Amino acid sequence: EGEGPYLLSKLGDRLLIAGDRHWRDVTIRARVRQFFSWNISPSVNLSYRDACLNGLACRIRDVRSYYFLCLEDFDRVTLYRIEDDEQIVLGQVFVPLDRTRFHLLEARCRGDRLTCLLDGREVFAPVDATYSSGWFGLRSNAKAGFLDAEVTADEEAWQGHLARLGAGERQLASLREQYPQPVFQRQIPRPFEGPGSLQLRRVEAEDAWGFFWTAGDGRRVAAADLEGQLRWTVDLEGPAPEDPAPISLKAADVDGDGHDDLLLIDHNKVKLFSGRTGELVAERPLPLSGPLMGVPGRTAPIGYLYAVRFRPAPAPLDIIILDADAGGGRNVWCYDHQLRPRWHRLLPFAFGHNMHFLDVDGDGRDEAMIGHCLLNGDGDLLWSLEEMHYAPHGAMGIHADSVVLGDLEGNGALRLASVSGDDGVLFADAATGEILRRDRIGHAQGITAARYVRDEPGIQVLAGTRHRAYGIFVLYNGKGDRLHRWQPDFVNQNGRPVNWTADGEELLLLSSPDSGTGLFDWRGRLVVPFGEELRRATVIPHPLAAGDPRDQLLAVTPERIALYTQDRPIPAGQEQLFSPVRHYWRGNTIGVISHPRWVARPA
């Protein structure tokens, strides 16, 4: 709109996208001017290229998979097929390019034929069927100008596009009929008015749940049951000026009495409150900064807080805290259930933003997967990934952003799956740290693992990307083979698993500005769309109904806490019910792993 030209590179390296993922046979053209002979990095997927590449992107499957017709430096025109970090040349011609004027680039996509023109003259027309449809746009990794960009389609292509959209909508509507839809069940009173956040907590019996409610100003926490009945309230000192960034409180049964206790940081102190009574059990000041992080002599920049079974049951849980900044952390402090110091460990390289805990060797004590280092309960380093003994190429690729650990293949062998920033997705042997697979999909950041595909053995790992290429989702089997890849939007890095039907296949809870908000199947289809309240709520899925392992939905909005459930019962004749065992190591949102389990239907 308006007058041009526009300098896309004022924003840095960019891919400007329009249309939708269903477009096939279109013509895209624009006048492009190459200004300078150096590029701008970091790049979405051209970081390893010194060349200046500016032009047209066609059939964009995601922001790292598309065709790219471009002016390259000042001496050639090239058509690339972009596949993550690979750029496959499909056509190229050497021709002088004039930096003082705009050149007309045109790409005509018809079936598997890609006809490319420069200044009205055909330069090559390769055949390639890798990408059959997708968005279209403008791509720039150097200072360039674009004028008169347009996309056209003939009548046949337009009618074909409408037919595909209509068929897709009918198929999706039919698919949605197979799934229960959410219906409002009841409202749960809040312990006190005003904004706040909710954390589920266990009370006594395995299926008895309540919640902690934290006031928006961080100065008050209440414990209540799911009827809204207040159990107790504690007043906190509130954040200190030098406190680290706010972190979620933890609900964990530290003392083993059946009630999840309250563990949090308040006014530069770690505090533990009894889940049964709300009484303060222990507190201690945060440690001073450890080596290589923070300011010496000042409070450590604490980022993470966990309760871990480092000693065999029935011993109480231990507490660990970790420092962190935007690039991860280096120090781990361990305390017992009375917050008495046990050990401190400086790790050899930075960990990321989510840890995992599992009894790897079968001795009844959990090991701690801190980034790419496995520690035992005494703080000993058992192994570290060989990959982390050098800095992988890329601006942000030297730590594990998030990890999951478990029997991913369903054969009893424990595996690590790690989203490792610019190094992509890694699969490793949890007993030795040997890397088994690597897949570079961009800056891999978010991860969950669950039975997303009913007929696949084990559980499936869903990885999502972030910096420089937001929103690509890749689903793997437990061995690390790709099962599906899609891009719901350009902001998300993952969702979380939801056991909605108890039939052995979990759905993905996702709030997407482009694809909608609700529950998606493993092929990226929105099969359970949310209504208005659920769309704007913080939604917490959890099995809350006795005898029904399906997740219900707690919807927290500024106005109320609402409980939503399925609009139909479990079908008659479904005698075995899927009831996965989940671990939420960081609150209940990040790095979730959902282990398969089946239970008999109650009589």
Language-model segment annotations:
Residues E1-R29, R33, R113, Q159-Q171:
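Low-complexity, Ser/Thr/Pro/Gly-rich disordered linker/stalk regions
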Residues E3-P5, L90-V95, T115, V123-F124, ...:
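Beta-propeller-forming repeat regions
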Residues A125-D148:
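Flexible glycan-contacting loops in extracellular carbohydrate-active proteins
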Residues R14-R21, G91-L97, F136:
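Beta-strand-rich interaction surfaces with strong enrichment in secreted/lumenal proteins
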Residues S9-L79:
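Secretory/extracellular carbohydrate-interaction modules
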Residues E83-L104:
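Short, aromatic/His-centered strand-loop micro-motif at the edge of beta-sheets
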